[in-house]
Amino acid sequence: MAKQIVFDDDARGPLLAGVSKLARAVRSTLGPRGRNAVLDKGWGSPKVTKDGVTVAEDIELDDPFENLGAQLVKEAASKTNDVAGDGTTTATVLSEAIFREGLKMVATGADPMALSRGIQKAVDTAIAQIAKMATPINEKSKSDIKQVATIAGNNDPQIGDVLADAFTKVGKNGVITVEEGRSNETYVDVVEGMQFDRGFLSPHFVTNQDEVTVELDDCYILLFEEKISNNKKMIPLLEAISKAKKPLLIIAEDTEGEALATLVVNKMRGILSACAVKAPGYGDRRKAILGDIAALTGGKAIFKDLGIDLESVKVSDLGRAKQIRITSEATTIVGGAGKKADIEGRVAQIRREIEATDSDYDREKLQERLAKLAGGVAQINVGAATETEMKERKALIDDARAATQAALEEGIVPGGGTALLRCRAAVEKLEKATEGDQKLGVRIIRNVLDQPMRAIANNAGLDGAVVVNRVLQMKGKTEGYDANADKYCDLVAAGIVDPAKVVRTSLTNAASVAALLLTTESLVTEIPVEEEPAGGDHHDHGMGGGMPDMGGMGMGGMGGMGGMGGMGGMM
């Protein structure tokens, strides 16, 4: 496939045009008075959203060079969303502003590489200021969490209430999932203890016939990595547990054949209350989860590489739990008898693995394991009147959840673009201490720190420049403009706050992408191929000169059939 190449200003011009188109579409959604964007999905009903990253991800431009710029900025928005869960619109607005300011400097002869280094220095300074400004929030305070969640949820107090309820129930280490509900109400379901998606292997184990569940109190738990099919190896252990008059849960790769039949018969005869479920996960992940359950219940996971046979397993090797509830689809362990030190050690190990992994999938699975050990699992069931509203609301709550999690991690700063604006003084100080073209790079960041506030004010129907100047004249570090109430006030006291992690990530990713764009000297894309029309009329001789008479097969030639009405005689 042939390629087309452009250089220098011919490359940077289309890049800026593409970035500007994307930023203009996304910018209009910023702030409490931001406007909606309507996205045509090509099927079903159109999607109405105020979520910046959703708008950005839907944009593809015709011009291949412009599209390169748009796609790079889209990546900044997506990365911000992945890391912090919010701040995607801010990242897009800042990317465009930094790139636009940088191009002005390049046009006057500045070295793009020196500009890039200056930009990075200024960003590091601003990030240090954001960290100083950040105030930790109390994870047990429902009102603190509600403030952050309400702002992240587009100033919807119901979203704030629901997320505050979820976080106070499971803590910052808990997992909160957002699912589509089956009613108009939005509510939280909390699963206490450890739950995994494996159900009973036989309906004969059921103890509660009304709810079709197995309920085992003060229960022993056998954790076995391999399949169990030989009942002879299992009988010594079953006899010991039967004497103790306690129920037994077997978690193994599978329990089948004679072994399963023995458990069922003993259960039905009232000799031993038992149940068997398959171990969750596969391969190394299964080993890890069995290790988690062992820590939680104070038992020992019997792995095949330990060389321990089922016959030699003692009652002291088993875990214990106050209550176990098993449905056909899931097992929940509540009140494990594990030592606190062992559980905390396991939690610390999982946290180290989370920090070390580069895989988003692995990180998500590790966080699920962490939640089941350290917190709990809360499911938010989203209710709405229509499917379109449901999808929009679900996306909004999911973003607000991630932003609230970010606030619990790194604290909060004044919202409404104020935190970035308050970094300007420190960046100005750095500018005075920097020389050459790097000084111009620092100046670029100084000039763009007001852009998010300008966009919020413009969307609220005010002059952004006037609002920025008014806020700069205010002496309090937490004072700024509340676009929702249309007033100037102490934003933290009014509950207008942003997670520090969101602000930091937005600026970092925006500067990274803008610096890449500024140091671009050439663009290479495939030459667009114009597609042939799908069908031609009877004058189209595209089939080649060898078959000229095929023109008569055009739709016009079907008139000779006398019209479909003539088929009436066949009825």
UniProtKB/Swiss-Prot annotation:
The record's Gene Ontology biological-process terms are: chaperone cofactor-dependent protein refolding; protein refolding; response to heat
Coiled-coil zones = none
| Chief location of this protein within or outside the cell | cytoplasm
E.C. number(s) listed in UniProt: 5.6.1.7
| GO CC terms, sorted | GroEL-GroES complex
Q: Where in the cell is it found?
A: Cytoplasm
Residues involved in ATP binding: T29, L30, G31, P32, K50, D86, G87, T88, T89, T90, G416, D498
Q: Which UniProt keywords apply?
A: ATP-binding, Chaperone, Cytoplasm, Isomerase, Nucleotide-binding
Xref: InterPro entries: Cpn60/GroEL (IPR001844), Cpn60/GroEL/TCP-1 (IPR002423), GroEL-like_apical_dom_sf (IPR027409), GROEL-like_equatorial_sf (IPR027413), TCP-1-like_intermed_sf (IPR027410)
Q: SUPFAM superfamilies given for it? A: GroEL apical domain-like, GroEL equatorial domain-like, GroEL-intermediate domain like
GO molecular-function annotation terms?
ATP binding; ATP-dependent protein folding chaperone; isomerase activity; unfolded protein binding
Q: Which CDD domains does its entry note?
A: GroEL (cd03344)
Which reactions are catalysed by this chain? Answer: ATP + H2O + a folded polypeptide = ADP + phosphate + an unfolded polypeptide
Assembly, in brief, is: Forms a cylinder of 14 subunits composed of two heptameric rings stacked back-to-back. Interacts with the co-chaperonin GroES.
The cross-references to PANTHER family, in alphabetical order and at most eight, read: 60 KDA HEAT SHOCK PROTEIN, MITOCHONDRIAL
Family designation: Belongs to the chaperonin (HSP60) family.
Q: What does the protein in this record do?
A: Together with its co-chaperonin GroES, plays an essential role in assisting protein folding. The GroEL-GroES system forms a nano-cage that allows encapsulation of the non-native substrate proteins and provides a physical environment optimized to promote and accelerate protein folding.
Which NCBIfam families does this chain map to?
Answer: GroEL, PRK00013.1, PRK12849.1, PRK12850.1, PRK12851.1
Task: Give the protein name, as stated in the record.
Answer: Chaperonin GroEL 1
Origin species? Rhodopirellula baltica (strain DSM 10527 / NCIMB 13988 / SH1)
| Gene from which this protein is expressed | groEL1
